[in-house]
């Protein structure tokens, strides 16, 4: 098995170093080590992750660092409880040592991750791991990665994704990034920059300098481009930003107000809402021809469009029924149907990558809520609430949402929560932060 991975971000804007990670499958026997994540997990699986052993100072340090990131990813998912290394009975310095499963059962571990880091003659490092079912003594999955030393964090996220998938049966979401709006300064003179980070808050950097306010960044399906809205001299402009090259391209300089540009699933179009004639409608722009087509035609305000993952339908927010509600229509603008009928006002609908749910923001009784419902409007579930919670964005596996929360003092922070409503956690950022957008799994 071979996987080609790219995307080690440098501190300089737009520079990216290609990373080749060669993956070898270690022989395995499938064991029945399973977490059912569809119902919500209240009792995380106890998992032991001893330090990956190395043969010199560099590889030993990397082994410790890799285990730290893998542990944080898995623990942060809410599905796993990483056991305290002080309780470990057996040492596993490398893969040649056979686990004594009775020792791991004695500390109540259900899963065991064993690994090593080996320097190669060409300066690269081989990082290998095995996931064991402690009760059966069977190997669940094993992989080996060949990589440069400065790409250890990327490899760590990939390992965590492999473990997550092996136990849950679904794709992980750790080898991803988040773009967001970094906010500084007083509320009367707010500076809003485009920023990017790994999903765990590492590798933070700014993409714009703050000279003009930025809003609503969104990733392309390849995770290589971002579309966002910027106000320059009070004129809204929609840009495309290439993360790999650092090149910024003006997509359009639109009269009136423009809101929430977002890519189509095939990456060939951008959908947005524009107020061209004093009325806000939804438009779609073909990135190949730069031609726009109008999708809605109604005297109400239509905004916040989001494609279904197959591109055949669009969900959006409209007040055509009197109050703000969520609607679904075909990709050509036909067949408009209202799907939200609960109390309160609904906003910012966004379709899950799985296609099974639409997340939303809801305002009711002076409180804000983040929730999700099925595309037909059934099964509405509130996941969290607060003074102001807004801007949900999906992890690529459709199992976790990220959003921003503002307290009564105006401080904004990023948070994530499981789609079942468990495991809300704050994501650390160097400044206040809002309007997150989650990338697909990195190529």
UniProtKB/Swiss-Prot annotation:
Keywords: Cell cycle, Cell division, Periplasm, Signal
GO cellular component, one term: periplasmic space
Compositional bias (Polar residues): 423-432
Highest taxon, organism lineage: Bacteria
Coiled coil ranges: none
Compartments reported by the entry: Periplasm
Extent of the signal sequence: 1-31
A GO BP entry: protein import
First-listed, main subcellular location of the protein, grouped into a coarse class: periplasm
Region (Disordered): 423-443
Similarity comment: family membership: Belongs to the TolB family.
Subunit structure: The Tol-Pal system is composed of five core proteins: the inner membrane proteins TolA, TolQ and TolR, the periplasmic protein TolB and the outer membrane protein Pal. They form a network linking the inner and outer membranes and the peptidoglycan layer.
Function according to Swiss-Prot or TrEMBL: Part of the Tol-Pal system, which plays a role in outer membrane invagination during cell division and is important for maintaining outer membrane integrity.
Protein's UniProt name: Tol-Pal system protein TolB
Organism encoding this protein: Rhodospirillum rubrum (strain ATCC 11170 / ATH 1.1.1 / DSM 467 / LMG 4362 / NCIMB 8255 / S1)
